[in-house]
């Protein structure tokens, strides 16, 4: 129930932000148009955003014939987690990463890059997929997929605001500075809304993944290895669609300094420390 409340709050917050931007661009008429668009986007996000995200990454569905070891691993972990078997996808990218998507456990999918399968051992890969299945089990995937879709729409609308500026109901330009301000601040606001939920969700998925696999040290080792390898390998698709970054097990976007303040993922060092403490104590709390 709590995850449905979080989903509703997220959709309401992003819808409100969408309407504010619409009002800045076109006054009351712009707010009305933005509301209609936002409602349509929320409907679309719920039913189709998983397919859109998988298409963005050109993910290819695999089965036990085309990727036997990986597919069997996901099936075994799904059974341990008490989940239906999700659809399994591979993404032809060198950057090591993985994510889960879908509106509920019955309509879930997990995806991994070919790079992560090359970099990680089988034990480490089990830790990663257990983490993703924890997202599925706790229905985080609906939240992350919707927020990724809506954040992308906010960025597009903010760019529109910068180009056309602020206008009244008659279409007259009123305050060009306001348009620039919206274009700069709206994506930040959208990122903060995502970040408010995403960081805590990653810690919870680490804990849940450790419970599913029974091996928190494997996930800790995987996170350390992904962190070290990913920094030197570009992930162009993720860079083109930055709103989807929070779906990944590790933030795929390059950059540091101020950019890290708005990261949707907690610090890798802290995640590893928590997992190693679980391994030491045997307590998954």
Curated annotation (Swiss-Prot):
Name under which the protein is recorded: Protease HtpX homolog
Active site (catalytic residues): 132
UniProt keyword annotation of Transmembrane helix present: yes
HAMAP family cross-referenced by the UniProt entry: Pept_M48_protease_HtpX (MF_00188)
Family: Belongs to the peptidase M48B family.
GO BP terms, alphabetized: proteolysis
Free-text cofactor note: Binds 1 zinc ion per subunit.
Gene3D superfamilies in the cross-refs: Metalloproteases ('zincins'), catalytic domain
Keywords of this entry: Cell inner membrane, Cell membrane, Hydrolase, Membrane, Metal-binding, Metalloprotease, Protease, Transmembrane, Transmembrane helix, Zinc
PANTHER family (alphabetical): PROTEASE HTPX
Location in the cell: Cell inner membrane
Gene Ontology molecular functions: metalloendopeptidase activity; zinc ion binding
TM ranges: 7-27, 30-50, 141-161, 177-197
Species of the source: Paraburkholderia phytofirmans (strain DSM 17436 / LMG 22146 / PsJN) (Burkholderia phytofirmans)
EC number(s) reported in the record: 3.4.24.-
Membrane topology reported for the UniProt record: Multi-pass membrane protein
A GO CC annotation given for this chain: plasma membrane
Organism classification: Bacteria, Pseudomonadati, Pseudomonadota, Betaproteobacteria, Burkholderiales
Cofactor: Zn(2+)
Annotated InterPro entries: HtpX_protease, Pept_M48_protease_HtpX, Peptidase_M48
